[in-house]
């Protein structure tokens, strides 16, 4: 009985981990001041670029940066800069 309970618990934990890794994480692909996606094939600066856009984490996916939990209103570089200027002026 204890062995089957332990086996069930380990299986459940493994499935939860797979869900976390393989689950669809909401996010967005940020664009620079020219409206172009940040490329990351040569220089992977996704974490830095995502932090500029207000996201806490980013990584290279299919040759461009993807930022986890990046809202649509922070996707464009100029929208982020405008928010910062508005914040400084108030």
Swiss-Prot record:
Residues 1-23 form the signal peptide. Keywords: Disulfide bond, Ion channel impairing toxin, Neurotoxin, Secreted, Signal, Toxin, Voltage-gated sodium channel impairing toxin. Expressed by the venom gland. One of its GO terms (cellular component) is extracellular region. Disulfide bonds join 40-60, 46-65, 50-67. Has the structural arrangement of an alpha-helix connected to antiparallel beta-sheets by disulfide bonds (CS-alpha/beta). Belongs to the long (3 C-C) scorpion toxin superfamily. This is Putative sodium channel toxin Ts28. The lineage of its organism: Eukaryota, Metazoa, Ecdysozoa, Arthropoda, Chelicerata.
């Amino acid at each position: 009985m204890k062995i089957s309970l332990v086996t069930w618990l380990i299986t459940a934990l493994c499935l939860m981990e797979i869900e976390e890794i393989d689950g669809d994480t909401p996010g967005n692909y940020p664009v620079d001041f020219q409206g172009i996606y940040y490329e990351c094939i040569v220089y992977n600066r996704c974490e830095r670029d995502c932090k500029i856009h207000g996201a806490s984490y980013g990584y290279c996916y299919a040759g461009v940066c993807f930022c986890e939990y990046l809202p649509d209103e922070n996707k464009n570089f100029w929208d982020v800069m405008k928010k910062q200027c508005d914040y400084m002026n108030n």
